[in-house]
């Protein structure tokens, strides 16, 4: 009794309870055993269709007319056919005799137009089955997409019409019925003419034999076996009402759409009544709702037969009998087509069986008593339920109460579609369907008897999915229940709300719906799985990997293409450009260089590639905004001067530097010109080599009226790299003018103090943090970046860089190198930054807040190219902005880490080659130490190669003086040593123990890093996990057995270099002179050794002089 209020109530069907006379003494097992009816012959009217055997399982009806081609045929036209065969009434079973009066029958009308009679006293055995030959009760083309687009009209069996809106997912009652259409004007709109009609046909049947006695229609009556008709025989009067509407074009006569609905009505005529003057049955559910109401507990004695209650499942096409005591299933009969109507013939009366009776019979009396009010409310709610079903591809509606009568009907409603001023409110049924089956996926049960009925489902879904927009999207759902609530109808006069109902107490002994194989839907299943996988992958990548292109291999990226920007135009641009020209300021950068492209930006500046107008060679120009504080600016300039003096074959160096102080807002307006084009993708953080766009100025004159800006984006056709050294472009610039290709290093005026704090570094202002990439040692989220990676190099691995530093390799203008590989030059921007702030005491809350922002990594937020971005707190600069321009050498980018990643086996790493590489690294480190400097951040990603395979040590962001006193170090590096570098696992992996623990350290930290680099050169790793684990063990002097056996001499040297005590580590000069390198034989060994000794000697003398006069990084 709780089924009306719980979600599982309607999964099987809404069943009507009628009490029939039955046999109380029979058990459930005996009832099931005897409840299987034998196939019977059936009378065929008109077409003489053969009888279709049915049983307790679903079997398709033979000779059933396809729903898509149903034509309503009145029975009166058949007698005039020549050679017509007399219709043959159904033959009773062998053991069946004519039933005397008083016996009960269950009469069932199905959608295929057949009438069947079941004997409830004989376990539901089919008494007779009759096909009157007039076709299906429902046929329509209104639901096809080509008729009304995304809307479809669904007819009801009683003549009402509903409209399904797929976009709104709602069911609306159409304010006209079939009869109103027929009564309206024949012309419907300008392009539609309505034709059709309503036909009534009456059939006289023998109540207990099912033989057709006569058929009457508008054309007359015809009788069969009138002589044999017994005067005392009971007669069943069946009246079929069929309504048909067709819409045709007035000019062509082509049919546009049609639909036809019909239903049967039944009346019982006892033997004492006359059959003359038959009047239409009084049992119409629309006219007398009292006889169509749900049978309550008071009326159960009328529908009970020996304590057996009859119920009909509309969704499962079943008629079932339950025992009143215990609610056990006594018998059931399965039809092969949907049930349209049902009647109980008992004691000379015809009782309509409501198809939406949801009363549940259970032995739990306590539940019924405790929830009596809820059950009564649910019974009243489901009394007005609507069932949306599908038969042979055609959607239809069934309801125990005509919902359309609750609302006004307008015969000319469709004519208002063309009238914009016409407003007709349409009642709406919210689309919250109640699936009739408790288990949507059927259990596969093998049975030959089910095959015929299963084919009906298959035909229905196949035809419907091809011809209409599917509402029933699941193949194992024959329909949905749409219960209509009176309470909500009173609150909302124009809305019908659908609610989910369930009944957990529904009898579980009822047999599940017949199974349907899933093999037919394998394509849909596979497509759904693939779509889910693709959608999930896409969502995960977008949510957790916002920049997947940055994870590509550097060898797969491109440097630039010739994808051009449109010329900057518009009144706003002209206004800004006029202001720039009228300022009268002339930039040295724009005077001496022709900007080619923007290579990227880092935490402290923007890097451009520019061509010198004098020598036609390409350089890397880096623009840095200097801090406003004098002390911080002084330290920046001192470090730049010191690094510019480093000249060694194994060390990259700077070329030139100058300062520019443009007028206020001048630099911002220049940058704004470049950011006008929305197609320029400037990331919030520093661009990676994979997505950094290249911008090229073709023609822009500060004093011209028009300017032309072109973009050079990444291109797969570009060569491997930028050239080592400064390449000589043999072709002179075709453009005589140049443009201010610059980006404001500080587009937010509120971070000036933050920059001051950030520039109070012991490390170089030109450097940023370069993090070792890898699975376990940092996920490339450092601060250095390397632009324009090699496309063809097999060693390059993906890396995400945000460096503000530039390390350039051999200088000079090598024409030969440029001619051989004119576009193989590569720029490396990857010098390490300290990420350390000066230990200063903020003088105000603002400066303290800004210092906090500067300390927080990553630092790219201190330099933003987004000129439209405003912060909530702005500070006006106390002095004009000053920019430092540094002219640096373009160099090839292929670091040692990429080289090792491309050689993952010992066989691929020859001992002599690895030692040769290491020796060159040691030579460069020895030169640094001889100059009184220490690198402090040696690792494979900071070691580079020239075009002729000469090793270069770069990324001098953490270079500092070896003799720097403790006081200055405190001033310049307030953070712990391990935090001063990057705080990332990648760099920390190569740091010495004293750096990690924050203790004081010396130049021996570079020796510790050299030991790890030598080990990694000789001992390859297959995975990053193995690399991290092994290097961690080696730091603790736990070497792999393979390394100690294969390289005994190198093992001893590495063990000394990795000593926990800095005093026990050898000097760089001792490493170079180690006996391990004596046996090496490679070209240029002698020259390299002599050059190294010469530079070291001169460097030592210079260092001594510097110590007497001033240090490379003098302190205040």
Swiss-Prot record:
Effect noted on mutating residue 994 to Q: In WRS; uncertain significance
Region described as Disordered: spans on this chain: 77-101, 550-571, 841-863, 1090-1116
Compartment list: Endoplasmic reticulum membrane
Induction (record text): By endoplasmic reticulum stress.
PTM sites of type Phosphothreonine: 802, 982
Modifications the protein undergoes after translation, according to the UniProt entry: Oligomerization of the N-terminal ER luminal domain by ER stress promotes EIF2AK3/PERK trans-autophosphorylation of the C-terminal cytoplasmic kinase domain at multiple residues including Thr-982 on the kinase activation loop. Autophosphorylated at Tyr-619 following endoplasmic reticulum stress, leading to activate its activity. Dephosphorylated at Tyr-619 by PTPN1/PTP1B, leading to inactivate its enzyme activity. Phosphorylation at Thr-802 by AKT (AKT1, AKT2 and/or AKT3) inactivates EIF2AK3/PERK.
SMART domains: S_TKc (SM00220)
A biological process term (GO) from this entry: regulation of translation initiation in response to endoplasmic reticulum stress
GO MF annotations in UniProt: ATP binding; enzyme binding; eukaryotic translation initiation factor 2alpha kinase activity; Hsp90 protein binding; identical protein binding; misfolded protein binding; protein kinase activity; protein phosphatase binding
Resulting phenotype, residue 164 to A: Decreased tetramerization and activation, leading to decreased ability to phosphorylate EIF2S1/eIF-2-alpha
TM ranges: 515-535
Annotated effect of mutating residue 395 to N: Decreased tetramerization and activation, leading to decreased ability to phosphorylate EIF2S1/eIF-2-alpha
Residue span(s) of domain Protein kinase: 593-1077
UniProt keyword terms in alphabetical order: ADP-ribosylation, ATP-binding, Diabetes mellitus, Disease variant, Endoplasmic reticulum, Glycoprotein, Kinase, Membrane, Nucleotide-binding, Phosphoprotein, Serine/threonine-protein kinase, Signal, Stress response, Transferase, Translation regulation, Transmembrane, Transmembrane helix, Tyrosine-protein kinase, Unfolded protein response
Family: Belongs to the protein kinase superfamily. Ser/Thr protein kinase family. GCN2 subfamily.
Domain notes: The lumenal domain senses perturbations in protein folding in the ER, probably through reversible interaction with HSPA5/BIP.
Cited function: Metabolic-stress sensing protein kinase that phosphorylates the alpha subunit of eukaryotic translation initiation factor 2 (EIF2S1/eIF-2-alpha) in response to various stress, such as unfolded protein response (UPR). Key effector of the integrated stress response (ISR) to unfolded proteins: EIF2AK3/PERK specifically recognizes and binds misfolded proteins, leading to its activation and EIF2S1/eIF-2-alpha phosphorylation.
Protein name (Swiss-Prot/TrEMBL): Eukaryotic translation initiation factor 2-alpha kinase 3
Lineage per the UniProt record: Eukaryota, Metazoa, Chordata, Craniata, Vertebrata
Protein encoded by which gene: EIF2AK3
């Amino acid at each position: 009794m709780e089924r009306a209020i719980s979600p599982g109530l309607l999964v099987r069907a809404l069943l009507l309870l009628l009490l029939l006379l039955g046999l109380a003494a029979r058990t459930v097992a005996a009832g099931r055993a005897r409840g299987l009816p034998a196939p019977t012959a059936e009378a065929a009217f008109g077409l003489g269709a053969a009888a279709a055997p049915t049983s307790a399982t679903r079997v398709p009806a033979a000779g059933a007319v396809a729903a898509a081609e149903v034509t309503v045929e009145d029975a009166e036209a058949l007698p005039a056919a020549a050679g017509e065969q007399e219709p043959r009434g159904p033959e009773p079973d062998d053991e069946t005799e004519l039933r005397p009066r008083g016996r009960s029958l269950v009469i069932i009308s199905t959608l295929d137009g057949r009438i069947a009679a079941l004997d409830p006293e004989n376990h539901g055995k089919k008494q007779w089955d009759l096909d009157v030959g007039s076709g299906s009760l429902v046929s329509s083309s209104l639901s096809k997409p080509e008729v009304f687009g995304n809307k479809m009209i669904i007819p009801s069996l009683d003549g009402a019409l509903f409209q399904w809106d797929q976009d709104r997912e709602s069911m609306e009652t159409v304010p006209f019925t079939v009869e109103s259409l027929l009564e309206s004007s024949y012309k419907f709109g300008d392009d539609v003419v309505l034709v059709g009609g309503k036909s009534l046909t009456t059939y006289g049947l023998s109540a207990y034999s099912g033989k057709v006695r006569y058929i009457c229609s508008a054309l007359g009556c015809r009788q069969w076996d009138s002589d044999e008709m017994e005067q005392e025989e009971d007669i069943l009067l069946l009246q079929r009402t069929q309504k048909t509407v067709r819409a045709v074009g007035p000019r062509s006569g082509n049919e546009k759409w049609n639909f036809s609905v019909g239903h049967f009505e039944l009346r019982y005529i006892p033997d004492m009544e006359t059959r003359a003057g038959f009047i239409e049955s009084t049992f119409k559910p629309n006219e007398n709702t009292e006889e169509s109401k749900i049978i309550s507990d008071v009326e159960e004695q009328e529908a009970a037969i020996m304590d057996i209650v009859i119920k009909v499942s509309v969704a499962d096409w079943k008629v079932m009998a339950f025992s009143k005591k215990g609610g056990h299933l006594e018998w059931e009969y399965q039809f092969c087509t949907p049930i349209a109507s049902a009647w109980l013939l008992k004691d000379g009366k015809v009782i309509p069986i409501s198809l939406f009776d949801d009363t549940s019979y259970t032995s739990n009396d306590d539940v019924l008593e405790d929830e009596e009010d809820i059950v009564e409310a649910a019974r009243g709610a489901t009394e007005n339920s609507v069932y949306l079903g599908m038969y042979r591809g055609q959607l239809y509606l069934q309801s125990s109460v005509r919902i359309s009568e609750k609302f006004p009907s307008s015969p000319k409603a469709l004519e208002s579609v063309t009238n914009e001023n016409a407003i007709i409110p349409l009642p709406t049924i919210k689309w919250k369907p109640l699936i009739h089956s408790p288990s949507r996926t059927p259990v596969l049960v093998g049975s030959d008897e089910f095959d015929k009925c299963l084919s009906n489902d298959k035909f229905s879904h196949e035809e419907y999915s091809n011809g209409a927009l599917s509402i029933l999207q699941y193949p194992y759902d024959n329909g949905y229940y749409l219960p209509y609530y009176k309470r909500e109808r009173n609150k909302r006069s124009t809305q019908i709300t659908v609610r989910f109902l369930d009944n957990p107490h529904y009898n579980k002994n009822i047999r599940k719906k017949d199974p349907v194989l899933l093999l037919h839907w394998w394509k849909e299943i596979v497509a759904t799985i693939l779509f889910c996988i693709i959608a999930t992958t896409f969502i995960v990548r977008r949510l957790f990997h916002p920049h997947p292109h940055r994870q590509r291999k550097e060898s797969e990226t491109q440097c630039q293409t010739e994808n051009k920007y449109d010329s900057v135009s518009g009144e706003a641009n002209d206004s800004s450009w006029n202001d720039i020209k009228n300022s009268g300021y002339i930039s040295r950068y724009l005077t001496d260089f022709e900007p080619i492209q923007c290579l990227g930006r880092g935490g402290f500046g923007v890097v451009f590639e520019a061509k010198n107008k004098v020598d036609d060679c390409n350089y890397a120009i880096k623009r840095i905004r200097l801090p406003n504080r004098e002390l911080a600016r002084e330290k920046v300039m001192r470090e730049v001067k010191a690094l510019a003096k480093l000249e060694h074959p194994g060390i990259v160096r700077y070329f030139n530097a100058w300062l520019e102080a443009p007028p206020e807002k001048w630099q911002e307006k220049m940058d704004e010109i470049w950011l006008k084009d929305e197609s320029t993708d400037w990331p919030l953080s520093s661009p990676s080599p994979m997505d950094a766009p290249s911008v090229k100025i073709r023609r822009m004159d500060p004093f011209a009226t028009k300017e032309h800006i072109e973009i050079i984006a990444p291109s797969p056709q570009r060569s491997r790299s930028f050239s080592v050294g400064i390449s000589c472009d043999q072709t002179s610039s075709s453009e005589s003018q140049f443009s201010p290709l610059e980006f404001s290093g500080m587009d937010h005026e509120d971070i000036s103090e933050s920059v001051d704090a950030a520039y109070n570094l012991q490390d170089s202002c030109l450097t940023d943090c370069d993090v070792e990439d890898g699975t376990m040692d940092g996920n490339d989220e450092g601060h250095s970046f390397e632009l324009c990676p090699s496309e063809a190099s097999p060693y390059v691995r993906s890396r995400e860089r945000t460096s503000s530093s530039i390390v350039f390799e051999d200088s000079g203008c090598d024409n030969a190198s440029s001619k051989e590989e004119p576009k193989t030059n590569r720029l490396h921007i990857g010098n390490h930054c300290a990420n350390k702030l000066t230990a200063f005491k903020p003088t105000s809350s603002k400066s303290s807040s800004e210092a906090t922002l500067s300390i927080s990594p990553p630092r790219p937020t201190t330099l933003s190219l987004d000129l439209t971005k405003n912060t909530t707190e702005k500070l006006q600069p106390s002095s004009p902005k000053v920019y430092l321009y540094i002219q640096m050498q373009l160099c090839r980018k292929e670091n040692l880490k990429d080289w090792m990643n491309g050689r993952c086996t010992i066989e691929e790493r020859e001992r002599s080659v690895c030692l040769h590489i290491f020796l060159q690294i040691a030579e460069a480190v020895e030169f640094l130490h001889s100059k009184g400097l220490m690198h402090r951040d040696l690792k494979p990603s900071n070691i580079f190669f020239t075009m002729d395979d000469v090793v270069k040590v770069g990324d001098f962001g953490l270079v500092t003086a070896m003799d720097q006193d403790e006081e200055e170090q405190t001033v310049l590096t307030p953070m712990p040593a391990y935090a001063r570098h990057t705080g990332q696992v990648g760099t920390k992996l190569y740091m010495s123990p004293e750096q990690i623990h924050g203790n004081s350290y010396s130049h021996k930290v570079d020796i510790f890093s050299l030991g790890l680099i030598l080990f990694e050169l000789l001992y390859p790793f297959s995975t990053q996990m193995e690399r991290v684990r092994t290097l961690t063990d080696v730091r603790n002097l736990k070497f792999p057995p393979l390394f100690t056996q294969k390289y005994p001499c190198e093992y001893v040297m590495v063990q000394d270099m990795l000593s926990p005590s800095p005093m026990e580590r050898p000097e760089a000069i001792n490493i170079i002179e180690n006996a391990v390198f004596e046996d090496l034989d490679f070209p240029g060994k002698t020259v390299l050794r002599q050059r190294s000794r010469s530079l070291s000697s001169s460097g030592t003398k210079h260092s001594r002089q510097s110590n007497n006069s001033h240090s490379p990084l003098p302190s205040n």
